[in-house]
């Protein structure tokens, strides 16, 4: 878990307190100054971030579209200015940015304050409640969980 990435998601939610959950990611993308468009991308492309435009492939399930929009917004806010690719730029830098965008999306769509209200929900309950893919819900409960969340869940297990 990257605390700077989590903080960036929290900061964005504090800046726009009018949003409730499940988060209207399309409206938030617009508020931030980006434009979300559906596009007929060729497989396997599902999402493209270019400047202020976020393109999402047509025909995807709603929960996947929501996640991809949040993921692309993460790239926009976390990696702005890092769009140049160098010949010797190591693949781990790309993987790091992708992981950060995933973590940002997970915490933006499923913030700690909202997750706490559910007690210790299952992956399916999180996916259903927040309108996200189950894989992202599983990551949010696993690799992207904060230390405070893990401690709280451990206490709930003891009860």
Residue ranges and their predicted role:
Residues 1-159:
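Active-site hotspot residues in diverse enzymes, especially metal/ion-binding acidic/histidine motifs
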